[in-house]
């Protein structure tokens, strides 16, 4: 109950790929956040309807290029095969760095930790990622732990769809602190 009070009205933005975001990695954390009173905005590289790998259809609220980090308490990068569109994207890197520099919560799940790793956020930080992208985050300086969900300060990473629920719960807990 107390955690619910403390996160009520906080704001999170979840960044999804235009195509092939991973359904549960958006929908499960979003549900957990909203159930706890967090206001969630969905952002993507297009305002057209986005399609998940398993067929979920989601209409983004805003373009990710229009994200103003100051408006949010948490910035969350959602995974799925399409998430690689942000790996080398300078705007995605700027959003990650702006959020980190402002001590906002930064979350990334599945292959999305590569985006924040390439932005420089995971250097000497404990982190996890999807099995196929372990070397990508290690080469960017991350200390890979292999955990389902890993937290190092304001940065929360998760390994994939099976960890989506726990990822959401960990974000809520961090927002309540």
Feature roles, as predicted:
Residues 2-102, 106, 115-121, 134-146, ...:
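Extended, subdomain-level signal for the structured scaffold at the beginning of enzyme domains
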